[in-house]
Design a protein with these regions (language model features):
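Histidine-centered metal-binding segments
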Residues: 146-150
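Low-complexity, small-hydrophobic/phenylalanine-enriched stretches
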Residues: 100, 104-116, 120-122, 126-128, ...
Length: 150
């Protein structure tokens, strides 16, 4: 049995939520697990927010006690942030955005700060608008930049 409802409680440790179903006189479900893309060797974690509109699959028993939250759905209040079938897009509450356009092959990350841990290789040209700060040497094909003189 498929139902729609609104998340009213979130348990971050167990990745479960409670959902209120307006079409059932405001009945609130038991704690329901949220379906995730991966949970074993690779793991994904992203819980719905309190107040988020979700779809729930309940067991056929009709008790509304055992079921799973399948995901959130857009509605008149919470509308899609983009309207383009070629884009993968995530916007966080603080304004951070991650966007990939499979038609233009452009990955865009908009954030106050981006931290990359590990080695980074850039193949292609690099344009920097702003200052560059390095705590170590900057090496180019012509030699070691910190020891360069004019």
């Amino acid at each position: 049995m498929i139902r729609r409802g609104i998340v009213v409680a979130v348990d971050e440790k167990t990745a479960r939520v409670r959902v209120q179903m307006p079409d059932l006189d405001g009945l609130v479900s038991n704690w329901l697990p949220v379906v995730h893309h991966k949970t074993q060797k690779d793991k994904a974690y992203w819980l719905p927010d309190i107040g988020e509109y979700v779809v729930v699959a309940f067991d056929e028993e009709g008790e509304h006690s055992d079921g799973y939250v399948l995901g959130a759905i857009y509605n008149d209040k919470d509308t899609p942030p983009v309207a383009n079938k070629d884009k993968f897009f995530v916007r966080f509450e603080d304004g951070t955005e991650i966007e990939y356009d499979r038609k233009t092959h452009i990955l865009r990350v908009k954030a106050q700060t981006v931290i990359i841990e590990g080695n980074v290789n850039v193949i292609g040209n690099v344009d920097v608008i702003g200052n560059v700060h390095a705590t170590g040497s900057i090496i180019d094909e012509g030699g070691n930049t910190p020891h360069h003189t004019h």
